[in-house]
UniProtKB/Swiss-Prot annotation:
Location of this chain's protein in the cell: Cell projection, Cilium membrane; Cytoplasm; Cytoplasm, Cytoskeleton, Microtubule organizing center, Centrosome, Centriolar satellite
Keyword Translocase attributed: no
PANTHER family hit by this protein: BARDET-BIEDL SYNDROME 2 PROTEIN
Entries under Pfam families matching the protein: BBS2_CtH (PF23351), BBS2_GAE (PF14782), BBS2_hp (PF23353), BBS2_Mid (PF14783), BBS2_N (PF14781), BBS2_pf (PF23350)
Protein name as it appears in the record: BBSome complex member BBS2
Gene Ontology CC annotations of this record: BBSome; centriolar satellite; ciliary basal body; ciliary membrane; cytoplasm; membrane; motile cilium; neuron projection
Amino acid sequence: MLVPIFTLKLNHKINPRMVAIGKYDGIHPCLTAATQAGKVFIHNPHTRAQRPTAHRLSQSTQDSDISLLNINQSVSCLTAGTLGPKSTGDTLLVGSQTNLLAYDVHDNTDVFYKEVTDGANAIVLGKLGDIQSPLAIIGGNCALQGFDYEGNDLFWTVTGDNVRSLVLCDFTADGKNELLVGSEDFDIRVFKEDELVTEMAENETVTSLCHMHGSRFGYALANGTVGVYDRTARYWRIKSKNHAMSIHAFDLNADGVVELITGWSNGKIDARSDRTGEVIFKDNFSSSVAGVVEGDYRMDGQIQLICTSVEGEVRGYLPASKEMKGNLMDSSIEQDLIRELSQRKQNLMLELRNYEENAKALPGLSEGESKMGVIPANTQLQTALSVRRASESQKAHIELNISTPNETIIRAVLIFAEGIFEGESHVVHPSAQNLSGCVRVPIIPPKDIPVDLHIKAFVGGKTSTQFHVFEITRQLPRFSMYDLNVDPSAPEPTGKVTFCINDRPQRVVMWLNQNFLLPEGIDSPDVTFSALRGGGLLRISLQTSGEITLRTDDIDLAGDLVQSLASFLAIEDLQAESDFPVYFKELRATLTEVDEFHSVHQKLTAAMADHSNYIRNMLVQAEDARLMGDWRNMKKRYIELYDLNRDLVNEYKIRSNNHNALLARLKSVNQAIQRAGRLRVGKPKSQVITACRDAIKNNNINALFKIMRAGTTSS
């Protein structure tokens, strides 16, 4: 059994997912974590001499080994690592919703302090692609930004939604790091510098990512799912009723391969095999886990796995010795495994007994057939998918029709599908009087992604008490919520995107048949669909010159179609021209609002500064009156002071609301740049994103819309 080699009780609470280890003097590892009241604590048990107090750094009154770094803002992320080329020790990086601080703990100095308008929800430090110097990369409000050791902004791009997790990993095995980004739109995106390489769709917000080895990485979702990918292939995943607070890769059983270490919200720590997800080690804290890191904390040349809880408990574990032979569990956990295996054996014995009873019933079919669930040998489970428009009683949906070709009935159906049903599964259990050989299940995909439907059906006779289980998998195409039956009165879409391909029309037809739910194979690439989810039309047309025009008012749909078609036809670089009048009009209004909110923000900041000066003067006058015994004037000044203070609080509320509204508008602007990029592929996409950002920086709104339409700055 593996036990902690050290346990510490720190007198400071720890914010979840904000734990790091840094060698700030280049030698001694120090546990660093965000704590309450906008502070970061640095635990350094190695140099116990009194440490100097600086403008940000102060000694903790509760623990002599802890120094407190005052950020004066709510900390949203932190990390530590080598940033400067000449620095001997690690740099501490602390992100908030408005700023990024790079701090040299050893010299008590700011390396740089940058304002970040999009906030910093996640941070990672390291080398990216061909960029020579290490970057502090932050993910915020739909944007990614990378700073070097001087605070220069060397990297910027946009992503689909608010960023929640980041990790650097050699995803393409070319010897250079790619950036993996987990966001609130449930996607894991892979960036080769500012170029999007690929994306994997999950079914919840991606809260944590960690590099394991090679192109393999672990991930955690907000719904309690953890798992492992190797590139775009998912090896395994498990789901828990608790939330994964932190994941980390560490070789705990000393077999040369790292395991996925997960810290959970109920205080549990577990280590799972990267190949199978099998649990090889468990331990428990009395409170939620805050973070999992690694370091040579005892300075004895051995790396320990260090786990922390939100209450400030710290435990260190050494990898298992050879004598343990990989047996890291305690005896009680082994007993749990024996109980689980016994239960599984009992279930299998029961299933075997059912088969034996069915076999005994075969000679006398007339008597036992109905009860024992014996069915004809030619019984098959048939499935069909069809598009159903909205009616008075039901929303528009995809109808899954499950049927048998003979007199047998379907007693129950279980469907497992990611991201469609709550809890990822759906059970249909018709009442006894409604039993038949056909079950219809309405399916409403929330967005345009391909979904595998894993179907299990219980099939038997009308009076059976035992049933045969049929299993079948059916894929729902990506663009299944689009119907060929079009309302003639529907208005023509005003938005469009146009691009050229060098491929046969038959290949486009193949793509249509593979990605849309069509009643029968079509042989023309010129089609019109009705969008069931958002309304409106989608027209796809192909000229003999190879020019494709997609007409829709939904810019997101246009981007999805361009990316899907380019992937199917293996197009690496694709330039496109687009025009979405309705969306561009909304964006222009949003940009005007951004300017207005910026102006209001500056006025409110100036007003608050004036009020602060008034309060300072009023306080001095009130204290003078008190010392002179002038109670009448003192009372008058304190009443005025109370009124000023109340005004200041009200102004702060207005400023806070203004700031939140500004953030929402900035998110819309970043998403607009992302959408304009998704209408192109490869280098043209990167060029559009960069050019759009430059246009916004220079406040050149007309150039911004020209770039979004034409895809180039020269047009």
